From Swiss-Prot:
HAMAP family: Ribosomal_uL23_B. Part of the 50S ribosomal subunit. Contacts protein L29, and trigger factor when it is bound to the ribosome. Keywords: Ribonucleoprotein, Ribosomal protein, RNA-binding, rRNA-binding. Pfam families: Ribosomal_L23 (PF00276). The lineage of its organism: Bacteria, Bacillati, Chloroflexota, Dehalococcoidia, Dehalococcoidales. This is Large ribosomal subunit protein uL23. Signal peptide: none annotated. The keyword Metal-binding does not apply. InterPro entries: Nucleotide-bd_a/b_plait_sf (IPR012677), Ribosomal_uL23-like (IPR013025), Ribosomal_uL23/eL15/eS24_sf (IPR012678), Ribosomal_uL23_CS (IPR001014).
Length: 94
């Protein structure tokens, strides 16, 4: 898997903005990515030093469309902790 396919998009919310003050940033990642791949992708894309990577899987939900039940897509997130002094400028000013 290409390292630029690992990181899908940054997830920006109120909770994630509070975590950014503690040098923790949240990204949506590819389903097949592991911690090593996420660490390499963040370090190469943003030129920072990653201390820790926590990953979680959010399963899809069942929704109704008329009489039919439809399964929404699941989501995989990574919470990335950076070394003190490093920042990802993508999250600043949000």
């Amino acid at each position: 898997m290409n390292l630029y396919e690992v990181l899908r998009r940054p997830l920006i919310s109120e909770k994630n903005s509070v975590q950014a003050v503690q040098n923790k940033y949240v990204f949506e990642i590819a389903k097949g990515a592991n911690k090593r791949m996420v660490k390499l992708a963040v370090e190469q894309a943003f030129n920072v030093t990653v201390e820790d990577v926590n990953m979680l899987h959010i399963p899809g939900k069942q929704k109704r469309m008329g009489r039919n039940l439809v399964q929404t897509a699941g989501l995989r997130k990574a919470i990335i902790t950076l070394k003190e002094g490093d920042k990802i400028t993508l999250f600043e000013g949000v």
